[in-house]
Amino acid sequence: LLTQYRMAPQIGSMVSEIFYDGKLKNGEREIKDIYKTSPSALNNVMSWIDTSSLGSKSYHQKEEFGTSIYNTSEANIIIDLLKQISKNEKFISALSDLDKDGDSSIGVICMYAAQRKLLQQKFREIDWSDEFKSMIKINTVDGYQGKENRIIIISMTRSDSSKNITQFMKRPNRINVALSRAMDRLIIVGSGQMWIDKNSELPMGKALDYIKNNQSNGCKVFDIDNEYSLLESGDG
C-alpha cells in the first residue's frame, strides 16, 4: 500500500479515489490550527467556486496571437480571494511563520499559460505587502511538478457552451499534479457545467463529484452568484 503524508486527508482521499483506485492511504499529519483564524474562503479543506451561473461571462477567451486561452472572470475571482486572504494579517503572519524556509505558502496553478500571464499581470497591478507578495506563486500546471504549497488555488480556465474538453485537460497525470500539490487547502475556480454529463468520468469531473458528495466533510461547492458573497463577508 502507498501512504501519503503531504495532503490533508480529504484531499488525499480524493486523489486516491480518482488516480489510485483507493489504494493511496493517508498517513498521520498534523494540520496546523492556523486555519481557525483564517478568512472564510479557507474554512473548507476543499472548495469548488463554480462560475457556471455567470453564463457567457464565465467563458474563456483565446489569445489574439497563439493558441492558449485565458479567463478574465476566473482571474478576477482569484485576485479577490487573494485580497481577502491578504487582509487577514493574523492569519498571514501565522502562515508566514510556518513557511519560514522559503517555500511559497499559496500557489495558484493555471491550466493554461495565457491564464498565468493574465494573473501575474493582474497580481502586479495591486499594491500587496512585501510579506504577502513573497508568499504567492503563480505558475502553470506543467511548471508545478514536484512542488507543494499549503494552499493551492486552481484556475480551470476552459469554459464555453460546447463543453468540449481538449486532450490537454484529459491527461490524468496533469490533473493529478494539479490536485495533489495542496497540503492543507484546495480551492478550484471554474465552471462546474464543463465537468458534468459527458465529462463527468474525466478526472476533473470526478473531482467535482467528490467535492459535491463530501459537503459534510470539509468540502463545499460555492455558486459564484448566490454564495460567493459569503466568501466576501466576514474575515474568519
Describe each model-derived feature in a short phrase.
Residues 23-121:
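Conserved helicase/translocase motor-coupling segment
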Residues 5-8, 113-116, 144-145, 158-161, ...:
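Conserved nucleotide-binding/hydrolysis micro-motifs of P-loop NTPases
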Residues 5-8, 12, 75-79, 169-179:
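Amphipathic alpha-helical transducer elements in NTP-driven molecular machines
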Residues 9-10, 57-59, 117-118, 147-149, ...:
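Switch/connector loops and helix/strand junctions flanking conserved nucleotide-binding motifs
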Residues 139, 143-159, 176-177, 185-189:
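A short beta-strand element within the Helicase C-terminal
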Residues 25, 107, 125-140:
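Conserved RecA-like helicase motor-core motifs
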